[in-house]
Amino acid sequence: MPRGTGYLRARIRHLVVTRAADRLTLGILGRRHRAQEIALREVELRVPGWPASRDGLRIAHLSDFHLGDLMPVGRAVEAVERIARRRPDLVACTGDVVDLDVDGCEPLLEAMGAVQAPFGRFLVLGNHDHLHDAAELVAMAEVHGLRVPHGQVMRAGDAADPLLVGGVDWGRTVRELDRAVDVLPAVPDLLLAHNPKAFHAAARRGIPLTLSGHTHGGQVAFPGRPRANLSFAHRLSAGHYRRRDCALFVNVGAGAWFPLRLHCAPEVVLLTVRRG
């Protein structure tokens, strides 16, 4: 399978940092991390610009599973099945399905695609999804009923009054993401972007709600202060932000790249979106 730019560097980092940390602690860090429950968090989000006809829409927001050594596929599937039992209206996965290789990720994509959500199931890719074989991951996702709106705005729900769902592919910088958001063919109601830096352009375009991941909430935060964390490269790192009538929600992720999360529990999130 093809390997994207950065695969070798990421593989070396994984061996030198992630696995080494686990071995130095005689496997304790890894075992504790894998045993940590993925929380199902419920959040009511008030968004001034949200369509009145979609008040109360419930979104299963999934992000950053990082399938691999630190996230067995069964653990990820169980988290998806748990949130599926809450009967969300829409499923939104904001990337980093895998940590390194796409091999073995199909059961998770199948579980996401099996969620009975009347507004559909959507996925955008993160930086880790591009390391190995992004095209293969997208193909598997689409086979299992996930829609991938990279650079597109798709209609969801009632054909007469659709919810417009847009998505942008992974971008590292504000400039890259500004371009990606600015060229969307329409202004969506909901934007999916792995990197929360897309919110700058989204708010400028008047997109009511943006969902992101990527930051992991720093993985280590101060007790009771989720935004006071180790994600130094991201001012928008955890939870809810607002700019004028537009809102951003950053999921801190179900997985990790390093086997430690402190005061920053792994999560899947059931969002209830209210206008106001």
List PLM regions with ranges.
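Solvent-exposed loop/turn segments at secondary-structure junctions
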Residues: 97-99, 127-131, 154, 171-173, ...
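Active-site-proximal beta-strand elements of phosphoester/diester hydrolases
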Residues: 56-66, 162-171, 190-194, 247-253
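Active-site neighborhood of phospho(di)ester-bond hydrolases with catalytic His/Asp-centered motifs
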Residues: 60-63, 90-96, 120-127, 149-152, ...
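Conserved beta-sheet core of the metallophosphoesterase superfamily
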Residues: 196-275
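Acidic, histidine-bearing metal-coordination/catalytic regions of metal-dependent phosphoesterases
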Residues: 1-58, 69
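Beta-strand-turn-beta hairpins that frame and shape the catalytic cleft
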Residues: 38, 47-60, 146-147, 153-166, ...
